[in-house]
């Protein structure tokens, strides 16, 4: 890594197993976990040539990510550059960046060797899009970074936000089926109704990904975090959001499962609400965040994308 990446961030990138990467689509942020590596001061990932991320990056190169280590979390924003052997438009920069790409490829293979072993075990199940001919290599250049401990901001580098403008009246959605009702039962049961997740928010500066606690309550999906953490994104009162929750596997892609709830958010600072405070307090407690310092994002789901291994689907909550 170069000196442009703070040493504490570099250590988290070396220790973390997955990077939760967000891109911006015309309908809001898209967020999924990806295996990755760090090299030459950048984060490197691969994705299918026809994936949502690859298509969105052609329109908008702004990107954000989140990496967790055992005790700390690193969040970053930046821009993406892709390298595709089948796209002649990337050949010139691929040649120019040859030594860096070779270094990145070495680190990527070394860091994720256990997943390549998993692919070998499941070789007869792996779709073409998940094999090298169907992939593009992506370079994420970090422009802003932050470290969070126990969900709270410990350090930040770059021009992050510092305020949360929440609604005055928070409305919880107690009626209707769970937003995860359309997710296959095995995945839904594995995820449960609350836990640790990642939230991508669409902002005027591009996507921002933050660590959150999440909960399902009645017909609503919610993300909760200390207000100072959400302030990094300086969100509007009603941003487009994507909440991603998953059950990772340490070596086998076929065993990974998760869901992404995409839709419109409603931001509220629990202690500042003029009405709906009791419901917001209860939901923050359900998610596992101290209400006195909690910011809550209620999500009106437009779509829920789920995956298990290489199988995925989309449901549209009522």
Regions found by a protein language model. Name each.
Residues 1-3, 72-182, 227-230, 242-318:
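Charged, gly/pro-rich active-site loop segments
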Residues 1-20, 167-198:
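Short, basic/aromatic recognition patches
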Residues 8, 52, 230:
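Short Gly/charged-rich anion-binding patches and loops
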Residues 11, 26, 68-70, 128-130, ...:
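Generic marker of residues within folded, mature protein domains
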Residues 16-49, 55, 63-69, 74-79, ...:
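Short beta-strand segments
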Residues 54-58, 231-236:
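Surface-exposed connector loops and short turns at secondary-structure junctions
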Residues 177, 186-190, 199-201, 206, ...:
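Compositionally biased accessory segments in Actinobacterial proteins
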Residues 238-240:
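Extracellular Ig-like/FN3 beta-sandwich strand-entry sites
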